[in-house]
Amino acid sequence: MSLTRLLIKDFRNIENADLALSPGFNFLVGANGSGKTSVLEAIYTLGHGRAFRSLQPGRVIRHEQEAFVLHGRLQGEEREMSIGLTKDKQGDSKVRIDGTDGHKIAELAHLMPMQLITPEGFTLLNGGPKYRRAFLDWGCFHNEAGFFTAWSNLKRLLKQRNAALRQVSRYEQLRPWDKELIPLAEQISTWRAEYSSAIAQDMADTCQQFLPEFSLTFSFQRGWEKETDYADVLERSFERDRMLTYTAHGPHKADFRIRADGAPVEDTLSRGQLKLLMCALRLAQGEFLTRESGRRCLYLIDDFASELDDARRGLLASRLKATQSQVFVSAISAEHVIDMSDENSKMFTVEKGKITD
């Protein structure tokens, strides 16, 4: 899938925009604060239901407006479809696909698999485990049809179990929740383990190309002890969980550890090297999806030139072109991206929320 057209209304500093897009590279050039990142964020929001710079919908709605509206035309192999998202200040969303309402945001996410590379994206490597769980869960969501339902049910049951921990005095009182929770936890952990194993070679190969000076290793940790039954862990941990008033073990505590030469990457790599690693991981994940399903990602890259020298920018550009995917790149100057441009790409200039090509 690729976006052929994007309409933006009352999103951040953009009052109205109607963009005809290239199926290849689309460049957004403008000064800081011009609105170029807002275009990337609008695309991301259309596919995720939320912005990547703010979780509060009111902050991305243009000043003194009640809602934002995003609309896109998606070109697939066989046909084109329309998608739309409206969200108001209260956070209420309306999703429309091919002219019909009542759809879920998860449907948009499935239609528009995206990889996001931003200056804030270092959290994948130096942030908490939740960011690396999200990396694995993106892959599971796009590779396992039942993942989203299982993951949603797991979140619901954990919330209910944690609330119950404040009220119960004996473990037997928790069994109704654990009876449902245990098979879900084991299934999600199995999916994550299988995905991390399947993509490991792709990640290793891509990382070797981007960071040949390091030996990188990847390890999945499921959130409770190896070779231990989750049911036993929950029962054994009851008193501690009750004291903490939350469930201390499970797939919600999983991690995906990345090491360079045996040490955590956040302690070993420079900022430039961390950005290269982040790019390599996102590329590997997108390429794995294409190979396994035939579907291509949209790549969103904010502030392309930051942290990368000319050689590394050239390497990233060549790898992105090889994916034959649709790519959106923001930059302060056209000079930073002109070498990536070809006859099929489009260059947009962004100034004070106005976009021209």
UniProtKB/Swiss-Prot annotation:
Disulfide bonds: none annotated. Keywords: ATP-binding, Cytoplasm, DNA damage, DNA repair, DNA replication, DNA-binding, Nucleotide-binding, SOS response. It holds the Pfam family SMC_N. It is found in: Cytoplasm. InterPro entries: DNA-binding_RecF, DNA-binding_RecF_CS, P-loop_NTPase, RecF/RecN/SMC_N, RecF_2. The keyword DNA-binding applies. One of its GO terms (cellular component) is cytoplasm. Signal peptide: none annotated. GO terms for biological process: DNA replication; DNA synthesis involved in DNA repair; double-strand break repair; SOS response. The keyword DNA damage applies. Its main location: cytoplasm. ATP binds at G30, A31, N32, G33, S34, G35, K36, T37. GO terms for molecular function: ATP binding; single-stranded DNA binding. HAMAP family: RecF. The RecF protein is involved in DNA metabolism; it is required for DNA replication and normal SOS inducibility. RecF binds preferentially to single-stranded, linear DNA. It also seems to bind ATP. Belongs to the RecF family. This is DNA replication and repair protein RecF. It comes from Salmonella paratyphi A (strain AKU_12601). The gene is recF.
